[in-house]
Amino acid sequence: MGYRVAIVGATGEVGRTFLKVLEERNFPVDELVLYASERSEGKVLTFKGKEYTVKALNKENSFKGIDIALFSAGGSTSKEWAPKFAKDGVVVIDNSSAWRMDPDVPLVVPEVNPEDVKDFKKKGIIANPNCSTIQMVVALKPIYDKAGIKRVVVSTYQAVSGAGAKAIEDLKNQTKAWCEGKEMPKAQKFPHQIAFNALPHIDVFFEDGYTKEENKMLYETRKIMHDENIKVSATCVRIPVFYGHSESISMETEKEISPEEAREVLKNAPGVIVIDNPQNNEYPMPIMAEGRDEVFVGRIRKDRVFEPGLSMWVVADNIRKGAATNAVQIAELLVKEGLI
Protein backbone atom coordinates (compact mmCIF):
# COMPACT_ATOMS: atom_id res chain seq x y z
CA MET A 1 0.00 0.00 0.00
CA GLY A 2 1.31 3.43 -0.91
CA TYR A 3 0.66 6.88 0.53
CA ARG A 4 -0.02 10.34 -0.81
CA VAL A 5 2.77 12.56 0.51
CA ALA A 6 3.06 16.36 0.46
CA ILE A 7 6.25 18.32 1.07
CA VAL A 8 5.89 21.93 2.20
CA GLY A 9 9.08 23.90 1.64
CA ALA A 10 10.11 21.50 -1.11
CA THR A 11 12.71 23.76 -2.74
CA GLY A 12 14.73 24.44 0.42
CA GLU A 13 17.74 22.49 1.66
CA VAL A 14 15.70 20.22 3.94
CA GLY A 15 12.83 19.95 1.45
CA ARG A 16 15.13 18.63 -1.26
CA THR A 17 16.67 16.26 1.26
CA PHE A 18 13.18 14.95 2.12
CA LEU A 19 12.96 13.82 -1.52
CA LYS A 20 16.37 12.13 -1.37
CA VAL A 21 15.65 10.34 1.88
CA LEU A 22 12.16 9.19 0.82
CA GLU A 23 13.72 7.70 -2.31
CA GLU A 24 16.74 6.15 -0.58
CA ARG A 25 14.63 4.55 2.15
CA ASN A 26 12.03 3.43 -0.40
CA PHE A 27 9.14 4.99 1.48
CA PRO A 28 5.88 3.84 -0.18
CA VAL A 29 4.92 7.04 -2.03
CA ASP A 30 1.97 6.60 -4.39
CA GLU A 31 1.49 10.29 -5.09
CA LEU A 32 3.68 13.29 -4.36
CA VAL A 33 2.60 16.94 -4.05
CA LEU A 34 5.23 19.67 -3.67
CA TYR A 35 4.53 23.07 -2.13
CA ALA A 36 6.72 26.11 -1.60
CA SER A 37 6.47 29.90 -1.55
CA GLU A 38 5.06 31.87 -4.50
CA ARG A 39 8.56 32.75 -5.70
CA SER A 40 9.33 29.04 -6.11
CA GLU A 41 6.05 28.21 -7.85
CA GLY A 42 6.62 26.42 -11.14
CA LYS A 43 10.05 25.04 -10.26
CA VAL A 44 10.54 21.41 -11.23
CA LEU A 45 12.00 18.79 -8.88
CA THR A 46 12.72 15.13 -9.56
CA PHE A 47 11.70 12.12 -7.48
CA LYS A 48 12.46 8.57 -8.60
CA GLY A 49 13.14 9.77 -12.13
CA LYS A 50 9.83 11.61 -12.47
CA GLU A 51 9.46 15.39 -12.61
CA TYR A 52 7.09 17.26 -10.29
CA THR A 53 6.08 20.91 -10.54
CA VAL A 54 6.10 22.94 -7.32
CA LYS A 55 2.83 24.60 -6.31
CA ALA A 56 2.34 27.68 -4.14
CA LEU A 57 0.29 27.40 -0.96
CA ASN A 58 -2.90 29.44 -1.21
CA LYS A 59 -6.40 29.58 0.24
CA GLU A 60 -7.81 27.60 -2.67
CA ASN A 61 -5.69 24.56 -1.85
CA SER A 62 -7.54 21.49 -0.62
CA PHE A 63 -5.44 18.92 1.18
CA LYS A 64 -8.04 16.17 1.38
CA GLY A 65 -6.65 12.82 0.31
CA ILE A 66 -3.08 13.60 1.39
CA ASP A 67 -1.89 11.15 4.05
CA ILE A 68 1.32 12.77 5.30
CA ALA A 69 2.76 16.27 4.94
CA LEU A 70 6.43 16.91 5.68
CA PHE A 71 6.90 20.59 6.59
CA SER A 72 10.17 22.52 6.48
CA ALA A 73 9.16 26.04 5.55
CA GLY A 74 9.77 27.98 8.76
CA GLY A 75 7.76 28.56 11.89
CA SER A 76 5.28 31.13 10.58
CA THR A 77 4.31 28.91 7.63
CA SER A 78 3.90 25.94 9.96
CA LYS A 79 1.76 27.93 12.40
CA GLU A 80 -0.54 29.07 9.61
CA TRP A 81 -0.73 25.99 7.40
CA ALA A 82 -0.16 22.89 9.55
CA PRO A 83 -3.61 23.17 11.23
CA LYS A 84 -5.23 23.57 7.79
CA PHE A 85 -3.60 20.36 6.58
CA ALA A 86 -4.53 18.59 9.82
CA LYS A 87 -8.15 19.78 9.51
CA ASP A 88 -8.29 17.98 6.14
CA GLY A 89 -7.14 14.74 7.79
CA VAL A 90 -3.44 14.99 6.96
CA VAL A 91 -0.79 13.94 9.50
CA VAL A 92 1.73 16.80 9.61
CA ILE A 93 5.38 16.18 10.54
CA ASP A 94 6.85 19.62 11.14
CA ASN A 95 10.54 20.48 11.15
CA SER A 96 10.16 24.02 12.54
CA SER A 97 10.16 25.05 16.20
CA ALA A 98 6.52 26.23 15.97
CA TRP A 99 4.86 23.23 17.64
CA ARG A 100 7.67 21.56 19.60
CA MET A 101 6.68 22.70 23.07
CA ASP A 102 2.92 22.48 22.52
CA PRO A 103 1.69 19.97 25.16
CA ASP A 104 -0.74 18.48 22.63
CA VAL A 105 1.93 17.86 19.99
CA PRO A 106 4.38 14.94 20.37
CA LEU A 107 8.08 15.70 19.91
CA VAL A 108 9.58 12.53 18.50
CA VAL A 109 12.95 10.94 17.87
CA PRO A 110 12.14 7.37 16.76
CA GLU A 111 15.20 5.82 18.45
CA VAL A 112 14.33 7.53 21.74
CA ASN A 113 10.56 7.92 22.27
CA PRO A 114 8.70 6.08 19.48
CA GLU A 115 5.76 5.46 21.81
CA ASP A 116 4.87 9.17 21.70
CA VAL A 117 4.04 9.14 18.00
CA LYS A 118 0.49 7.92 18.69
CA ASP A 119 -0.32 11.18 20.47
CA PHE A 120 -0.50 13.08 17.17
CA LYS A 121 -4.26 12.57 17.06
CA LYS A 122 -4.89 15.50 19.41
CA LYS A 123 -3.87 18.09 16.79
CA GLY A 124 -2.81 16.02 13.78
CA ILE A 125 0.76 17.31 14.12
CA ILE A 126 4.06 15.69 15.12
CA ALA A 127 7.05 17.94 15.79
CA ASN A 128 10.58 17.19 14.66
CA PRO A 129 13.08 18.33 17.34
CA ASN A 130 15.93 20.76 16.81
CA CYS A 131 18.92 19.30 14.95
CA SER A 132 21.34 19.68 17.87
CA THR A 133 18.83 18.10 20.27
CA ILE A 134 18.17 15.08 18.04
CA GLN A 135 21.75 13.85 17.86
CA MET A 136 22.32 14.51 21.56
CA VAL A 137 19.30 12.53 22.79
CA VAL A 138 20.04 9.61 20.44
CA ALA A 139 23.46 9.36 22.11
CA LEU A 140 22.18 9.99 25.65
CA LYS A 141 19.23 7.57 25.64
CA PRO A 142 21.20 4.28 25.92
CA ILE A 143 23.22 5.69 28.82
CA TYR A 144 20.11 7.16 30.43
CA ASP A 145 18.44 3.74 30.33
CA LYS A 146 21.51 2.04 31.79
CA ALA A 147 22.66 4.48 34.46
CA GLY A 148 20.29 7.46 34.57
CA ILE A 149 21.39 11.02 33.83
CA LYS A 150 21.08 13.97 36.24
CA ARG A 151 22.68 16.75 34.24
CA VAL A 152 24.42 17.50 30.98
CA VAL A 153 26.89 20.18 29.93
CA VAL A 154 27.17 20.40 26.15
CA SER A 155 29.08 22.61 23.74
CA THR A 156 28.05 22.42 20.10
CA TYR A 157 30.04 23.09 16.94
CA GLN A 158 27.34 23.64 14.34
CA ALA A 159 27.62 23.69 10.56
CA VAL A 160 26.48 26.71 8.57
CA SER A 161 23.89 24.68 6.62
CA GLY A 162 21.76 24.75 9.76
CA ALA A 163 21.26 28.47 9.13
CA GLY A 164 20.11 28.05 5.51
CA ALA A 165 21.22 28.80 1.96
CA LYS A 166 22.52 32.33 2.64
CA ALA A 167 24.74 30.98 5.41
CA ILE A 168 26.24 28.43 3.02
CA GLU A 169 26.83 31.25 0.52
CA ASP A 170 28.53 33.34 3.22
CA LEU A 171 31.04 30.61 3.99
CA LYS A 172 31.71 29.87 0.31
CA ASN A 173 32.12 33.52 -0.69
CA GLN A 174 34.23 34.51 2.31
CA THR A 175 36.54 31.49 1.99
CA LYS A 176 37.02 32.17 -1.73
CA ALA A 177 37.77 35.85 -1.11
CA TRP A 178 40.28 35.03 1.63
CA CYS A 179 42.07 32.43 -0.50
CA GLU A 180 42.27 34.87 -3.42
CA GLY A 181 43.49 37.73 -1.22
CA LYS A 182 40.39 39.82 -1.95
CA GLU A 183 38.31 42.01 0.33
CA MET A 184 36.03 39.99 2.58
CA PRO A 185 32.43 40.22 1.29
CA LYS A 186 29.73 41.45 3.66
CA ALA A 187 27.95 38.64 5.49
CA GLN A 188 24.36 37.98 4.38
CA LYS A 189 23.34 35.76 7.29
CA PHE A 190 25.70 36.18 10.22
CA PRO A 191 26.59 39.27 12.28
CA HIS A 192 30.30 38.57 11.74
CA GLN A 193 32.60 36.80 9.31
CA ILE A 194 32.10 33.03 9.54
CA ALA A 195 35.06 31.87 7.43
CA PHE A 196 38.05 30.98 9.66
CA ASN A 197 36.03 32.05 12.69
CA ALA A 198 33.68 30.72 15.37
CA LEU A 199 30.51 32.50 16.48
CA PRO A 200 29.12 31.67 19.96
CA HIS A 201 25.75 32.95 18.79
CA ILE A 202 22.95 30.80 17.34
CA ASP A 203 19.48 32.39 17.36
CA VAL A 204 18.50 35.25 19.66
CA PHE A 205 19.91 35.99 23.13
CA PHE A 206 17.74 36.09 26.24
CA GLU A 207 18.25 38.20 29.38
CA ASP A 208 19.96 35.35 31.23
CA GLY A 209 22.69 35.20 28.56
CA TYR A 210 21.54 31.96 26.94
CA THR A 211 20.34 31.79 23.34
CA LYS A 212 17.11 30.36 21.99
CA GLU A 213 19.10 27.46 20.48
CA GLU A 214 20.61 26.67 23.88
CA ASN A 215 17.19 26.74 25.54
CA LYS A 216 15.83 24.37 22.89
CA MET A 217 18.42 21.79 23.93
CA LEU A 218 17.19 21.96 27.54
CA TYR A 219 13.42 22.02 27.10
CA GLU A 220 13.24 19.67 24.12
CA THR A 221 15.44 17.11 25.89
CA ARG A 222 13.14 17.13 28.92
CA LYS A 223 10.06 16.64 26.76
CA ILE A 224 11.57 13.85 24.63
CA MET A 225 13.04 12.00 27.62
CA HIS A 226 9.93 12.53 29.80
CA ASP A 227 12.18 13.84 32.57
CA GLU A 228 11.57 17.35 33.90
CA ASN A 229 14.46 16.96 36.37
CA ILE A 230 17.26 16.51 33.86
CA LYS A 231 19.42 19.65 33.67
CA VAL A 232 21.09 20.76 30.43
CA SER A 233 23.48 23.68 30.09
CA ALA A 234 24.41 24.32 26.46
CA THR A 235 26.76 26.65 24.62
CA CYS A 236 26.00 26.64 20.90
CA VAL A 237 28.67 27.76 18.45
CA ARG A 238 28.55 28.21 14.67
CA ILE A 239 31.74 27.04 12.96
CA PRO A 240 32.98 27.20 9.34
CA VAL A 241 31.87 23.70 8.31
CA PHE A 242 29.22 23.17 5.63
CA TYR A 243 27.49 20.03 6.94
CA GLY A 244 27.59 18.09 10.19
CA HIS A 245 27.08 19.25 13.77
CA SER A 246 29.52 18.16 16.49
CA GLU A 247 28.91 18.15 20.24
CA SER A 248 31.16 17.82 23.27
CA ILE A 249 28.98 16.30 25.98
CA SER A 250 29.71 15.80 29.68
CA MET A 251 27.10 14.22 31.92
CA GLU A 252 26.52 13.32 35.54
CA THR A 253 24.90 9.90 35.80
CA GLU A 254 22.70 8.52 38.57
CA LYS A 255 24.80 5.36 38.84
CA GLU A 256 28.38 4.49 38.03
CA ILE A 257 28.93 3.45 34.42
CA SER A 258 32.37 2.74 32.98
CA PRO A 259 33.47 3.93 29.54
CA GLU A 260 33.59 0.26 28.50
CA GLU A 261 29.97 -0.28 29.55
CA ALA A 262 28.94 2.92 27.80
CA ARG A 263 30.63 1.81 24.57
CA GLU A 264 28.81 -1.50 24.73
CA VAL A 265 25.32 -0.02 25.22
CA LEU A 266 25.96 2.56 22.53
CA LYS A 267 27.17 -0.08 20.06
CA ASN A 268 23.88 -1.92 20.56
CA ALA A 269 21.71 1.20 20.32
CA PRO A 270 19.62 1.88 17.20
CA GLY A 271 20.95 4.59 14.91
CA VAL A 272 24.34 4.88 16.65
CA ILE A 273 27.80 4.13 15.27
CA VAL A 274 30.66 4.08 17.78
CA ILE A 275 34.06 5.16 16.46
CA ASP A 276 36.31 5.30 19.49
CA ASN A 277 39.93 4.37 18.90
CA PRO A 278 41.81 7.63 19.49
CA GLN A 279 45.19 5.89 19.68
CA ASN A 280 44.77 5.24 15.94
CA ASN A 281 43.28 8.69 15.30
CA GLU A 282 39.80 7.20 14.93
CA TYR A 283 36.97 9.39 16.21
CA PRO A 284 33.83 10.97 14.71
CA MET A 285 34.22 14.00 12.46
CA PRO A 286 31.68 16.06 10.50
CA ILE A 287 33.19 14.99 7.20
CA MET A 288 32.44 11.36 8.04
CA ALA A 289 28.83 12.04 9.05
CA GLU A 290 27.96 14.06 5.94
CA GLY A 291 25.34 12.24 3.88
CA ARG A 292 24.75 9.62 6.59
CA ASP A 293 21.68 8.99 8.74
CA GLU A 294 23.41 7.65 11.86
CA VAL A 295 24.68 9.45 14.95
CA PHE A 296 28.42 8.91 15.46
CA VAL A 297 29.84 8.70 19.00
CA GLY A 298 33.45 8.60 20.19
CA ARG A 299 35.96 9.96 22.74
CA ILE A 300 33.98 8.08 25.42
CA ARG A 301 35.75 8.56 28.75
CA LYS A 302 35.26 9.05 32.47
CA ASP A 303 34.42 12.66 33.24
CA ARG A 304 36.86 14.49 35.53
CA VAL A 305 34.26 16.86 37.03
CA PHE A 306 31.05 14.85 37.34
CA GLU A 307 31.24 11.86 39.68
CA PRO A 308 29.87 9.52 38.52
CA GLY A 309 29.93 10.75 34.96
CA LEU A 310 31.04 10.42 31.36
CA SER A 311 32.26 12.63 28.54
CA MET A 312 31.86 11.93 24.83
CA TRP A 313 31.93 13.47 21.36
CA VAL A 314 28.85 13.21 19.12
CA VAL A 315 28.54 14.02 15.41
CA ALA A 316 25.67 13.83 12.90
CA ASP A 317 24.54 15.28 9.58
CA ASN A 318 22.29 18.15 10.66
CA ILE A 319 20.26 18.21 7.43
CA ARG A 320 19.66 14.45 7.39
CA LYS A 321 19.36 12.97 10.91
CA GLY A 322 18.99 16.46 12.32
CA ALA A 323 16.00 17.19 10.08
CA ALA A 324 14.89 15.26 6.97
CA THR A 325 15.78 11.71 7.98
CA ASN A 326 14.23 12.01 11.43
CA ALA A 327 10.98 13.26 9.85
CA VAL A 328 10.90 10.39 7.34
CA GLN A 329 11.62 7.92 10.16
CA ILE A 330 8.58 9.33 11.98
CA ALA A 331 6.51 8.71 8.83
CA GLU A 332 7.88 5.15 8.69
CA LEU A 333 6.88 4.69 12.33
CA LEU A 334 3.32 5.84 11.59
CA VAL A 335 3.12 3.25 8.81
CA LYS A 336 4.67 0.49 10.92
CA GLU A 337 2.26 1.12 13.80
CA GLY A 338 -0.75 1.26 11.47
CA LEU A 339 -1.55 4.81 12.54
CA ILE A 340 -2.24 6.05 9.00
Curated annotation (Swiss-Prot):
Keywords: Amino-acid biosynthesis, Diaminopimelate biosynthesis, Lysine biosynthesis, Methionine biosynthesis, NADP, Oxidoreductase, Threonine biosynthesis. Pathway: Amino-acid biosynthesis; L-lysine biosynthesis via DAP pathway; (S)-tetrahydrodipicolinate from L-aspartate: step 2/4; Amino-acid biosynthesis; L-methionine biosynthesis via de novo pathway; L-homoserine from L-aspartate: step 2/3; Amino-acid biosynthesis; L-threonine biosynthesis; L-threonine from L-aspartate: step 2/5. Substrate binds at Q158, R238. One of its GO terms (molecular function) is NADP binding. Its EC number is 1.2.1.11. NADP(+) binds at T11, G12, E13, V14, R39, S40, S161, G162, N318. It is an enzyme of class 1 (oxidoreductase). It comes from the Bacteria. InterPro entries: Asp-semialdehyde_DH_CS (IPR000319), Asp_semialdehyde_DH (IPR012080), Asp_semialdehyde_DH_beta (IPR005986), NAD(P)-bd_dom_sf (IPR036291), Semialdehyde_DH_NAD-bd (IPR000534), Semialdhyde_DH_dimer_dom (IPR012280). SMART domains: Semialdhyde_dh. The active site is at C131, H245. Phosphate binds at R100, K216. It catalyses: L-aspartate 4-semialdehyde + phosphate + NADP(+) = 4-phospho-L-aspartate + NADPH + H(+). GO terms for biological process: 'de novo' L-methionine biosynthetic process; diaminopimelate biosynthetic process; isoleucine biosynthetic process; lysine biosynthetic process via diaminopimelate; threonine biosynthetic process. Catalyzes the NADPH-dependent formation of L-aspartate-semialdehyde (L-ASA) by the reductive dephosphorylation of L-aspartyl-4-phosphate. Belongs to the aspartate-semialdehyde dehydrogenase family. Homodimer. This is Aspartate-semialdehyde dehydrogenase.
